[in-house]
Amino acid sequence: MDKQNPAPGVYLDTSWACYVESSAANNSSLSPLERSPAHYRHHSTHDREDTTAFKFGRLVHCGVLEPDTLARRYVVRPDFTELVTLKDGTKPANPRATKQYRELVAEFNSQNAGREILDPAEWEEMEAVCAAVQREAGDLFKSGAAEVVVVWDDAETGMRCKARLDWVDWERKRIVDLKTTRDAAEFEQSLGRYRYDRQAAFYLDGLRACGYEVEEFWFCCVESSAPYGVRAAPCCEQTIKHGRARYREALQLLAECRKKNKWPGYSSPTHWRLPTWARNGLYLETDGVEKVLERRTAQ
């Protein structure tokens, strides 16, 4: 796969570093574009903040989708506090503040350069999450391929697009996307809040554009804390249609911005107006001040 300009097709065993090198349009970049082209431009030239949630999500993805690569990509830092002693053989009150502790950590980090270092608690949490996924939704990941990269040219705009699919089950013709979440009971809200409908449609259409039959897009969401609740289901057709309309509008806007090389920010309203939810409970406009005061006095 050419890092800078990959040809349309489906790629397996493509590293994340290789994937992000391409400037092809991808789903995650469409979220800042929906705010404004200026936000898209900034997003495309600046690295995304690597939050604790993102890091743990990557760890869980690796544990569920590519468990054979865990040892190569991650290592657990031992509890060096047990090894730290003073010259008289006693234990210091604060082992982490000692020179010996810092030297042990520095040596360990040097020996494991290139791997992400985890605390024992992080590893145990990942194992618990992965066990929950396997117990409740393991059938989704029994056959297929992980981290499938898809590259295609959008027929309408001509733009090169790309996607990295968590899991593709070729036999059952489905894409599965794994999400970690704080509350799986509210995942329907996340579908709209984080534009997951757009992601589902974008990925389905991308794989189809490469000549593959695919019928369903599943989300499997797992809570990142005990008891690690799991929910999994395919998206309904209406959700896919809504997501398709959303990404089509975004791609058309992106194509126009690239063509003109103009990246405008927000447009301003003619006047600031309260949203409907903020006006609820206010009766001044219809009842007048006297009736409002009378109502509140009676309460």
Predicted features along the sequence, with ranges:
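Short, charge-rich amphipathic segments
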Residues: E124-E147, I175-E188, S267-L274, A278-G281, ...
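Metal-dependent nuclease catalytic cores that hydrolyze phosphodiester bonds in DNA/RNA
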Residues: M1-K162, L293-E294
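Metal-dependent nuclease catalytic regions and adjoining charged, substrate-binding loops involved
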Residues: K3, F202-Q299
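Mg2+/Mn2+-dependent nuclease catalytic core
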Residues: A145-A245
